[in-house]
Amino acid sequence: MARGGSDVAETRARLLDTARHLFAERGFEDVTVREICRGAGANLALVNYYFGDKLGLYLEVVNQAIAAVREFNSLAMTAPEGSDAEKRLRLFVRGLLHRVFELRGVDSWVHRLIQHELSRPTELATRILQEAMAPRIRYLAEIVAELLSCPKKDPRVMHCVASVHGLCLVYSRIVLANQFKAAMPDLASDGPFDVEDAVAHVSAFSLAGIRAMRR
């Protein structure tokens, strides 16, 4: 009996959802098609039917991850045309931190999947970096190079890019983490976290550091 359209869509969606979480948890190599199908409650043959093979399923998951990162990037790359470098940096920091703040507590399967690709790369690693990560890094590198008045290949540029980018992302792991307050209550603020305070701090700290690198 032919499968109904809604059944096909639901089964395919379950396979993708299960694959996303398993690939993000353990990486491509350590996950089997059998595990994915068992978790999705689907017949083993359906991975081949819908996606061709395990790599085809992984490619679909990677495409979803790239789309999610592109949306993330768009919030940090919104400076009006003609904005000076300092304003662009502040808007970059604001966009990134607001997105990190919005996503706190949300399952970060995209981040975990990318981390697996960086540590144990598959044939898709370069594509993920080029299409998902590179646009944001290049955008920030252009800002930093302008602030430093140097070519983008100057080693100071990527040092500063890593510092600014890392400082933004660390808030999701320390300042915003419930575990931080539980483990170090003496350092945790009593009041609610204000993302604009973080934006002001990271922007000022980053700009001061970049200015110091010009000397």
Please report, for each region that a protein language model flagged, where it lies by residue:
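Hydrophobic/aromatic-rich alpha-helical bundle segments in the mid-to-C-terminal region
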Residues: G105-H111, T126-A134, I143-S203, M213-R215
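Conserved phosphoryl-transfer catalytic core
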Residues: A65-M77
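N-terminal intrinsically disordered/low-complexity leader segments
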Residues: M1-E10, A177, R215
